[in-house]
Amino acid sequence: MARVKRAVNAQKKRRTVLEQASGYRGQRSRLYRKAKEQMLHSMTYSYRDRRARKGDFRQLWITRINAAARANGLTYNRFVQGLKLSGVEVDRKILADLAVNDAVAFTALVEVARAALAAAPEPTAA
């Protein structure tokens, strides 16, 4: 059986890892072992943070909606409750965009929510 020489494969693997780590500081961009270790951590962080990004954006949207709703005299939870009662199905991303870029449309939605809240019966405390 012929002997398998793996020098080409090993060099390619090392070159790939060092290219991926090219922007890192110090030994992490120059030494294979340090670069490989850093790449393992980096990939773990990027995997985790791609999932965390969804929640971060939702939190940002809610903060923006709350600020705009309070400027119009409603809190976030009352505003969302009023929209739900009135049957308006606009997601938080669009609401946040309206709050930042189209204050007139957002104010109209606040009025719709306020009207729905006024028409709805108040829950009685048991």
Curated annotation (Swiss-Prot):
Record keyword Ribonucleoprotein present: yes
GO biological process terms held by the UniProt record: ribosomal large subunit assembly; translation
Disulfide links within the chain: none
Protein origin, superkingdom: Bacteria
SUPFAM superfamilies xrefs: Ribosomal protein L20
GO MF: rRNA binding; structural constituent of ribosome
Keywords for the protein's UniProt record, in alphabetical order: Ribonucleoprotein, Ribosomal protein, RNA-binding, rRNA-binding
CDD domains, per database record: Ribosomal_L20 (cd07026)
Keyword Ribonucleoprotein part of the UniProt annotation: yes
GO cellular component, one term: ribonucleoprotein complex
Protein role: Binds directly to 23S ribosomal RNA and is necessary for the in vitro assembly process of the 50S ribosomal subunit. It is not involved in the protein synthesizing functions of that subunit.
Family: Belongs to the bacterial ribosomal protein bL20 family.
Protein name: Large ribosomal subunit protein bL20
Organism: Frankia casuarinae (strain DSM 45818 / CECT 9043 / HFP020203 / CcI3)
Source lineage: Bacteria, Bacillati, Actinomycetota, Actinomycetes, Frankiales
